[in-house]
Amino acid sequence: MGLVVGGALIALAVAPDVVRAQDAPKSPVRPRSTYEDLQMFTQVLNQIRVNHPDSIDTHDLLMAAIEGMVRAADPHSYVIPAMRLDPAKEEQLRSGKLHPVPVSFVFIGGAPVVASVAPGTAATRLDILPGDELIAVDGASVRAESAEELEISLSGPKQSAVVLTLERRRQDGTIVRLDRRVVRERPDPASAVPVAMMIDSAGTAYVRITTFAAERVADDLHDALDRLEKRGLKRLVLDLRDNGGGSVKEAADVAGEFLPKGAIVYTAEGRKKEVTDTGRVSRSFWRSERRYPIVVMTNSGTASASEIVAGALQDHDRALIVGHPTFGKSLLMRGFPLADGSAIVLVIGHVKTPCGRVLQRQYRSITTHEYYRLARADRDTAGRPACVTSGGRRVFGGGGIYPDVLLGEERTAPVWLARLVEQDVVLSWVGGYVSASSQSLGSLDAFLRAPAVPAAAVADFRTFAATQGVVVPADAESDAVLQRMLAEGVARARWGDAGGYSVEALVDQEVRAAVRALDRAGTLSGAGSAR
């Protein structure tokens, strides 16, 4: 046995009582009992305590073992150690005296990772993406060990700011670190349904739902559809892209707008009997089922409660799913108090669609980065289990919702575009342009009739970008991308999320593909009977 130092092999003396690896007892063929495993655990702990040359706190070793045990179960369960939370600060946050950072995190493999950005907040314009790993807060390392602890520690006075240092792994494998100055604020509940508009003369309506975390999502959708129906709504594009989910109840109520009373929306299953549940449409007597053709748009950012909606409408042949495979995250979680005042937040069940598809995708034996990267790359039906809808169509499971109409791969932003966003070049230019052009911009309705910025403004932006070290290619494709980005940015800066999403609906090629699929959606058999 030896060490290689500077290319030379230096022999090490081995004490007679040290057991060599090759001399160690062979692992028994029979399965080990839990008692034997616990014995081994105790022996390993004692060997470290007695023989390791460093002074290692036994408590730290045990906490690391517990964290590793929970992490081995799944990437979403976690332990909240006792005395980690600040009760006074938590109460101030819950009562509204303090405001949160409008970015939610999950802990995967012990690391805080962005789950979603609250719609209707300034943070949506900061290029913060799901899967970005939080490295530091105001230059200091992250000390929080749970999502709750992190939320409380990041809270502060209204409109105060905090700098989040994020690490992003791009599609090409390169890693970039980004500093984002995020203002603390609470999202506007109305931002859950920021856009509900007619988009053509054929009676096509476009509605976008950005979250199910608000309290009135289903009611806001109901009111929006009532208004659109009075304007001639005959068919609907329901956009759930980048909707990270939220309340299962709100999701069930949204699906219930389009399904008959009593129809199954989801089923929940776990080891304990009390976890088992069947979510069905429960609708007030004065609300009727809406029967027009529907296309639901999804992508890899569609997760959790939004997957429940998409899956229910697909399984009942009530809507055609157009876009990209969804993220594949839908777990039931519950907190359990422990004797010392700490707690474990544990996955206790899985959610299935009406025909039995498990929404949660595989998470074992992969890294945090792979967990998010694979959500964007999973486009193949090979090996995916299938089930049959109410009307006899085959739909695919295996994690997430697989679309009926699969669009081209979600395009990776070219380097120049990624740099424009990451370096806040677009945000800086748009602010100045809107301030100088507030009179000429007019109303949102007027802007939407021709959603574009003048050629002179595009040329001015190119010059400004060059001064920031970003050269925008001079070709037709880049020009088109730049024009769409600037038009959307101007509308969002001038009229908020409603403006930005409205422009996107009119210029987005994926929305146009969804509109083309509406004729096919009209041939579906419709909602099946409750099962």
PLM regions with names:
Residues S300-A303, G311, D315-V322, F327-I401:
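Acidic, polar loop-rich interaction surfaces within structured domains
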Residues Q22, K26-S27, R32-D37, N46-T58, ...:
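Cleft-lining beta-strand/loop regions that shape enzyme active-site pockets
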Residues A11-K26:
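Signal peptide processing junction and immediate N-terminal pro/mature segment
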